[in-house]
Amino acid sequence: MTANKPLLVVIVGPTAVGKTELSIELAKKIGGEIISGDSIQVYRGMDIGTAKVTKEEMQGVPHYLIDILDPDEPFSAFAFKERAQKLITEITERGHIPIIAGGTGLYIQSLIYDYPFDKEEISPEKEQEVKEKMAQLESLSNEALHDYLKSFDPDSAEDIHPNNRKRVLRAVEYYLKTKKLLSYRKKTVQFTENYDTLLIGVEMSREILYQRINCRVDSMLEHGLLQEVEQLMNQGYTSCQSMQAIGYKELIPAVNHEIPINQAVDKLKQHSRNYAKRQMTWFKNKMDVQWFDRAQTSLPLILDEITARIKKRRES
C-alpha cells in the first residue's frame, strides 16, 4: 500500500470486452466488493440496454451503485465520486478490496485523482440568466452547439465529439457560469492520487471486439430491449438525459414507427462500435493502464497476474 493510501482496483476497457466477468471472478478470488462505474446502470428499469449484471451473475459478490435512481434523476461525475469514495472507505474498513468495474474516463479520473469540482457561488440573477441561455442552446443541433463551443473554447471542442451533447453542454455551461475555459482549467490542474490504484485494462483485437458487440446487440434485442425502451417511454422518460445513452436513443424512433427496426439496430451497432473505439483511445492516451488481451490470455492466467500484482503492492 502506497503511503497508507487504500488499495483500489479499477477494471476498464471497451464495451462488450468482458469486464463484468473478470471483476466478479477477481472479487471472489481476492475478497473484493464491486462498485459499478457505469453512468447508466445507476438507473432502475434500464437493464438490458446497459448489460446490467443480474443477481445470478453476481454470484453473491456485493455490487454497488446499481439501480439507485429513477431515469429522470440526474447523475454526474461529482455525484459518482461522492458515493464511490464513501463506499471505498466502508469496503476497506471491512477488510475487503474495492473494485471499480467499468465506467467512463471522466468518472474514473475524478475518483482516483483529487479532481477538483468547482462550487463557485453565483447570484440567483446570474443563475437565471445562464438557465435561460442554456434553454436557448438546447434547441441547437449537435453540430451547431459544438460550433458555439468552438467559438470561445476551441481546445475543449477538439477534445469533445460533436455527438457527445452532454459534455458539450457541460463545457458551455461551465464557461457561462465562471467565464473560464474548461480546457484551461484541465491544463492547469495538478492531480494528486487519492488511492493506491491498480488500473487493469481488458482489450482484444478490433475485429473480435466488433463481432462481440454485434452479437451482444442481437442478444439484447432477443431478450427484450425494444420492449424495455417502449416501457421507459410509456413511463414518461423519453426526453430524459438517461435515454440519450447508447442502446436507448437509437431505438426511440423505431418505437415511434419513424424508422424501420433494422435501421435502428444498424445505428445501435455502429454507435456501440464507435464508442468502443473512443473508450480505447481515451484510456490508452490518458491513463497508466496495465492491459490484458482477453482473447489471447485465459481468465485464470489474468486473475493470477492481477492477484500477484495486488500481493506485491500490499507487501511494498
Swiss-Prot record:
Superkingdom, natural source: Bacteria
Organism: Staphylococcus carnosus (strain TM300)
UniProt keyword terms in alphabetical order: ATP-binding, Magnesium, Nucleotide-binding, Transferase, tRNA processing
PANTHER family from the UniProt entry: TRNA DIMETHYLALLYLTRANSFERASE
Binding of ATP, residues: G13, P14, T15, A16, V17, G18, K19, T20
Protein name in UniProt: tRNA dimethylallyltransferase
Pfam families, A to Z: IPPT
Transmembrane segments: none
Site (Interaction with substrate tRNA): T104
Taxonomic lineage from the root: Bacteria, Bacillati, Bacillota, Bacilli, Bacillales
Subunit structure: Monomer.
